[in-house]
């Protein structure tokens, strides 16, 4: 699971949990990628696992950096391995948000992100994160990545993208590997778009995302059809 927090140098503000899908093909087959989709929240991160991750991994890391004279301000992303007993191990740290985990997280975040960033970087004399609370949409969000032909080895560029929908309150198409060329949107990287949708259940969010994808087209477009399957099968 992806465990992302915001830090102001002392205090930690956890973001919503998320789970991504690294393999290119359905059923976790094919080569590894930067991520072919994600959903939030991640049921595998139970309240007990969340508390353990904060207690055993996140807080000691932040306090350790402060003790070493390098207090950390910004996003800290911990890639976690969670066993069936709920024990948590850290696979990696990144000083950034995750892609595509961020897209469903942002879809659920009701608090203005600018307010969060300003609070994190406020002068030390001010409250900062001590009394800061994030407001989340209680619904589930899912993001499905549309990748270019040849991804992840040698993604093709320049394919014209058609059928891009207008964003709504429940569906947003995030651009990544796109470029304007001759008045048309074309592919310019491996992971091209991330179609993100909200739903009352993961199944409903999944259906909304895949229904939207049906209207989008570019030559060689590839995507997984099972994003969210882990949570649905739990």
Model features per residue range: what roles?
Residues 53-76, 94-170, 181:
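Active-site "cap" helix and flanking loop/linker of ATP-utilizing ligase/carboxylase catalytic domains
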Residues 34, 144, 205:
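Residue-level signal for inorganic ion chemistry
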Residues 24, 36-39, 129, 161-164, ...:
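Short clusters of hydrophobic/aromatic residues that line enzyme substrate/ligand-binding pockets
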Residues 32-35, 72-77, 84-87, 138-141, ...:
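A generic structural signal for well-ordered coil/turn residues at beta-strand boundaries
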Residues 178-182, 186-234:
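Generic C-terminus detector
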Residues 25-27, 130-133, 178-185:
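Short beta-strand/turn micro-motifs at beta-sheet edges
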Residues 1-106:
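Internal nucleotide-binding/catalytic subdomain
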Residues 5-7, 146-148, 197-199:
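Short beta-strand-to-loop capping motifs
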């Amino acid at each position: 699971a992806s465990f992302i927090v915001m830090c102001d140098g002392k205090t930690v503000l956890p973001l919503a949990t998320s789970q991504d899908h690294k393999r290119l093909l359905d059923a976790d087959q094919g080569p590894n990628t930067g991520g072919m989709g994600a959903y939030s929240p991640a049921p595998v991160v139970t309240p007990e696992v969340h508390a353990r991750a904060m207690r055993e991994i996140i807080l000691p890391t932040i306090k350790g950096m402060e003790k070493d004279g390098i207090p950390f301000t910004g996003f800290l992303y911990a890639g976690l391995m969670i066993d069936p007993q709920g024990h948590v191990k850290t696979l990696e740290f990144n000083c950034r948000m995750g892609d595509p985990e961020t897209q469903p997280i942002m879809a659920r975040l009701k608090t203005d992100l600018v307010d969060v960033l300003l609070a994190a970087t406020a002068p030390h004399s001010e409250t900062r994160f001590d009394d800061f609370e994030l407001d989340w949409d209680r619904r589930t969000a899912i993001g499905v990545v549309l990748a270019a032909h040849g991804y992840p080895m040698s993604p093709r560029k320049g394919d014209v993208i058609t059928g891009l929908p207008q964003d709504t309150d429940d569906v947003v198409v995030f651009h990544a590997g796109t470029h304007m060329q001759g008045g048309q949107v074309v592919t310019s990287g491996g992971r091209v778009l991330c179609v993100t949708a909200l739903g009352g259940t993961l199944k409903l969010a999944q259906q909304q995302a895949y229904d939207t994808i049906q209207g989008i087209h570019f030559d060689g477009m590839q995507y997984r059809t099972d994003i969210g399957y882990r949570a649905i099968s739990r």
